């Protein structure tokens, strides 16, 4: 029986591992088949057509054959073509992109389809190719929110998680891993106002493509520096809680670079 072939699939390389002297194992995020593992035979050879193409944060179209039905199967890469459209991110934008890749590898199950999230990720990568510094913050926070909502790990942001009481617009609330969204305590370092949380929920809940949702959230966060800055540590704690140990490698690298 001939192996099933997936052709011209939109994809991004999340990570690559040495498999042999000449081959690589790839962790790839595809639009229609989710996160898949592929072996790229001969990709490390100087003459390989794969060599200049299989890079992170670059839009690809790939062809591969399925080696089985299990989620732990490693499939065989047969072709990869760079779609083009933007340059490779550099500096802090590159590190931010690798951080998002690590989140996807930690949080997405193998071969679970997330087409809308893929489209949002593609939009973020385009931003990373052209922006740096403070302009990245609202984009990263927005994608973190979309990712958590897509995989069912983000509570409703317009009610208190434990009581389902609607948020008071003028009150302050904190998002914490163990309790969800709750009234702020004096010990909380980062909180948002009820009106701000409710606006985020409205943006996430609108019946529109994730790319449009992403733009709406970015616009809301970019309107003021405070919401994005206050949201960052709360989302970071929630993401680390669900990613488990050890700390995200890209996050540790950011800490190490800041200490230099």
UniProtKB/Swiss-Prot annotation:
Coiled coil: none
InterPro entries named in the record: ARFGAP/RecO, DNA_rep/recomb_RecO_N, NA-bd_OB-fold, RecO, RecO_C
One Pfam match: RecO_C
UniProt record, GO biological process: DNA recombination; double-strand break repair
SUPFAM superfamilies per the UniProt record, alphabetical: ArfGap/RecO-like zinc finger (SSF57863), Nucleic acid-binding proteins (SSF50249)
Gene Ontology annotations for the cellular component aspect, listed alphabetically: bacterial nucleoid
Gene3D superfamilies recorded: Nucleic acid-binding proteins, Recombination protein O, C-terminal domain
Keywords on record: DNA damage, DNA recombination, DNA repair
Stated role: Involved in DNA repair and RecF pathway recombination.
Family, similarity comment: Belongs to the RecO family.
PANTHER family: DNA REPAIR PROTEIN RECO
Protein name: DNA repair protein RecO
């Amino acid at each position: 029986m001939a192996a099933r072939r997936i052709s011209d699939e939109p994809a991004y390389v999340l990570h690559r591992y040495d498999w042999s002297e000449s081959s690589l194992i790839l962790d790839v995020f595809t639009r229609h088949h989710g996160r898949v593992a592929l072996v790229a035979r001969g990709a490390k050879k100087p003459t390989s057509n794969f060599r200049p193409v299989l890079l992170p944060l670059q839009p690809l179209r790939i062809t591969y054959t399925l080696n089985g039905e299990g989620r732990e199967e490693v499939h065989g890469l047969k072709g990869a073509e760079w779609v083009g459209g933007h340059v490779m991110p550099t500096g802090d934008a590159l590190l931010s992109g690798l951080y998002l890749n690590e989140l996807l590898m930690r949080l997405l199950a193998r071969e679970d389809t997330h087409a809308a999230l893929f489209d949002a990720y593609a939009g973020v990568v385009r931003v990373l190719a052209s922006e740096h510094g403070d302009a990245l913050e609202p984009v990263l926070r927005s994608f973190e929110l979309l990712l958590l909502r897509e995989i069912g790990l983000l509570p409703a942001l317009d009610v208190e998680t434990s009581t389902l009481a609607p948020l008071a617009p003028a009150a302050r609330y904190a998002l914490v891993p163990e309790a969800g969204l709750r009234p702020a305590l004096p010990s909380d370092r980062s909180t948002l106002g009820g009106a701000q949380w409710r606006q985020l929920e409205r943006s996430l809940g609108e019946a529109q493509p994730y790319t449009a949702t992403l733009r709406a959230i970015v616009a809301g966060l970019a309107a003021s520096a405070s919401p994005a800055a206050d949201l960052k540590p709360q989302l970071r704690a929630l993401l680390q809680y669900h990613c488990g140990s050890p700390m995200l490698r890209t996050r540790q690298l950011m800490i190490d670079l800041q200490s230099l």
